[in-house]
UniProtKB/Swiss-Prot annotation:
Interacts with Sdhb within an Sdha-Sdhb subcomplex. The keyword Mitochondrion applies. Plays an essential role in the assembly of succinate dehydrogenase (SDH), an enzyme complex (also referred to as respiratory complex II) that is a component of both the tricarboxylic acid (TCA) cycle and the mitochondrial electron transport chain, and which couples the oxidation of succinate to fumarate with the reduction of ubiquinone (coenzyme Q) to ubiquinol. Promotes maturation of the iron-sulfur protein subunit Sdhb of the SDH catalytic dimer, protecting it from the deleterious effects of oxidants. May act together with SDHAF1. One of its GO terms (biological process) is mitochondrial respiratory chain complex II assembly. InterPro entries: SDHAF3/Sdh7. It is found in: Mitochondrion matrix. This is Succinate dehydrogenase assembly factor 3, mitochondrial. Pfam families: Complex1_LYR_2.
Amino acid sequence: MPGKHVSRVRALYRRILLLHRALPPDLKALGDQYVKDEFRRHKTVGPGEAQRFLKEWETYAAVLWQQAEDSRQSSTGKACFGTSLPEEKLNDFRDEQIGQLQELMQEATKPNRQFSITESTKPQL
């Protein structure tokens, strides 16, 4: 069973990094780093928390895939990524998670992001 779990985690991790290729370069860099940190941080959690972790990241991957598809099919060529977080979900977060979320939001909405990556903004799915 542990081998199956490890391969599921790795496949999800790779899928998310592939999906991030559809993001603008600065958001891709931010997202990639966040995913790497979160997966590393959750390496040693218990089975219950691991299942919740995987479920949330699988949902994220599905939403990101749909947004990337919508972006590719859009006639305007303008990509729209992200979603609102319902208040009831926020109420389930621990204080540490709220802090992480706030830091991520601030970083993602900075006018001059710290990442200066120059590559094509065309999605590579």
